[in-house]
Amino acid sequence: MAQNENQIGVLGAGLIGMSWAGLFSAFGYDTTIYDPYLKKQHVARNEISNIWASLDLLFDNLQNKKEVKFSDKLDDLKGASFIQENCPEDFFLKQELISKIERIVSQDTIIASSTSSFMPSELQNGCANPERIIVGHPMNPPHLIPVVEIVLG
């Protein structure tokens, strides 16, 4: 399965997921947000615009912005080289989503969770390639505070 080094998948369109997506897309990454409840895309697009406006105040030359794509199909993340998971802090939900996305993306794709509650070893349990599942827990909001706690399994 081919992956695109410039393609990022974001799981979850909540506050943290939107912040990540706005940051990635502002710096030119092809970013797709997966959320099964994408009923309010216009609200999400407005939030991305607000994030970009904040970043424009911090950086002089953000000229490579890419439109964020929204999807309710995990398969739309197939070519991503990096996945940032941001679903609610429900262990079984996170584990199920990580297990599903792991079967869709390349074996080399890094899957990071924004969790503040679970260890990577817990999220890796039952995964085919557990070494690529990490915690990438941001300080909030990630588009404004450039600090990410990275925890390996």
For the regions a language model picked out, list residue spans one by one.
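Rossmann-like NAD(P)-binding element
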Residues: 36-39, 54-110, 118-119
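Short, flexible turn/loop "capping" segments at secondary-structure junctions
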Residues: 25-26, 77, 141-145
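Rossmann-fold dinucleotide-binding core
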Residues: 110-153
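Hydrophobic packing residues within well-ordered alpha-helices of enzyme cores
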Residues: 44, 101, 123-124
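Hydrophobic/aromatic beta-strand patches that form the interior of the parallel beta-sheet core
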Residues: 32-34, 84, 134
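NAD(P)+-binding Rossmann beta1-loop-alpha1 motif at the extreme N-terminus of oxidoreductases
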Residues: 1-51, 69
